[in-house]
């Protein structure tokens, strides 16, 4: 990774990240600086990001790419107050999984909970990179967040991570009292590929007659291994998550075409019959995100299957805007977290 000049705040995260390479595309997108669809704070973030000259993540070793995100999230001071964090290793169905339990302070008794599966393309990300986002959801919802530390790729490939996610969900539903949780008031949530995992865990719970989930919260989710949607081509470059980077993430997760078509990898390919009976869904997408179209398509398909769905597109935003600490004070981020927390609170009461 290239060393870049020292800058503060949003500029620092942008600078230490990378400048993504151009990808083949069927249309020529508008440069971010001239794009009226990008919110002003986000546009300033992208201006520095895209002029950084750093090495693309997809050209790094996974451990180096992970370090970039960790350092970037640490570069901005954020509010982590109001929560109590503990760790526990659980065993379920022969799988050992470490969970990080995030509770709101000053609350006693068994609380409702939501499982949280983190984003980062199945390759990047951990609890520290997602702590601020999780904290915001916990404090505003009053529910416990159970962060699942699944094994990333390429150390493990599909379906290892999703099996760990489902095992952890089963354990919390059955043994929640051990961590101060009411397992009968349980939801699933996740961002990006974590949104994929939340959707898939909901499918698995239905198929396997597992936990009765109250809600699935899908933040800008991955739902299909199809890189030729309108949004993939329109936003292929210069908007944080690029087409080539997402292809690299999928390659680390699974390169097997038949596996990519399984509904536990690409839930958008599930039939309406397979989707019928799933818990209500709350789906957020970003206007300027390669994943926008597949997230919205999944919401529409859930609705077609008779599932209660609320789908919200945040105009002006880019992929993972709600995760990125330098964008944590952007009005669109605050509103997104408050809205999701309100949906959790309503479903888990």
For each feature predicted by the language model, list its residue ranges.
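Alpha/beta-hydrolase superfamily serine-hydrolase fold, recognizing
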Residues: 26-349
């Amino acid at each position: 990774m290239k060393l870049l000049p020292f800058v503060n705040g949003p500029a620092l995260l942008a600078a230490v990240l990378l400048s993504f390479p151009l990808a083949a595309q069927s249309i020529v997108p508008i440069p971010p600086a001239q794009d009226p669809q990008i919110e002003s704070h986000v546009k300033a973030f992208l201006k520095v990001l895209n002029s950084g000259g750093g090495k693309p993540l997809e050209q790094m070793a996974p451990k180096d790419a992970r370090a970039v995100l960790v350092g970037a999230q640490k570069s901005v001071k954020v509010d982590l107050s109001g929560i109590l964090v503990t760790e526990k290793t659980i065993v379920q169905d022969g799988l050992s999984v470490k969970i990080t339990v995030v509770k709101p302070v000053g609350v006693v008794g068994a609380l409702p909970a939501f499982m949280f599966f983190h984003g980062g393309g199945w390759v990047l990300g951990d609890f520290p990179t997602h702590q601020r986002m999780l904290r915001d959801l916990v404090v505003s919802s009053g529910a416990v967040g159970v962060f699942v530390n699944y094994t990333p790729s390429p150390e493990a490939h599909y379906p290892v991570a999703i099996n760990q996610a489902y095992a952890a969900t089963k354990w919390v539903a059955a043994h929640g009292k051990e961590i101060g949780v009411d397992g009968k008031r349980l939801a699933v949530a996740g961002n990006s590929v974590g949104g994929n995992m939340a959707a898939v865990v909901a499918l698995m719970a239905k198929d396997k007659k597992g936990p009765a989930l109250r809600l699935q919260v899908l933040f800008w989710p991955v739902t299909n291994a199809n890189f030729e949607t309108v949004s993939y081509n329109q936003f292929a470059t210069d908007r944080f998550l690029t087409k080539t980077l997402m292809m690299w993430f999928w390659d680390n997760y699974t390169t097997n075409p038949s596996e990519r078509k399984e509904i536990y990898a690409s839930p958008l390919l599930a039939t309406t019959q397979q989707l019928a009976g799933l818990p209500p869904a709350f789906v957020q997408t970003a206007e300027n995100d390669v994943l926008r179209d597949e997230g919205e398509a999944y919401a529409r398909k859930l609705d077609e299957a008779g599932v209660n769905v609320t789908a919200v597109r945040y105009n002006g935003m880019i992929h993972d805007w709600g995760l990125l600490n330098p964008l944590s004070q952007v009005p669109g981020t605050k509103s997104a977290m408050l809205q999701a927390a309100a949906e959790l609170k309503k479903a888990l009461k």
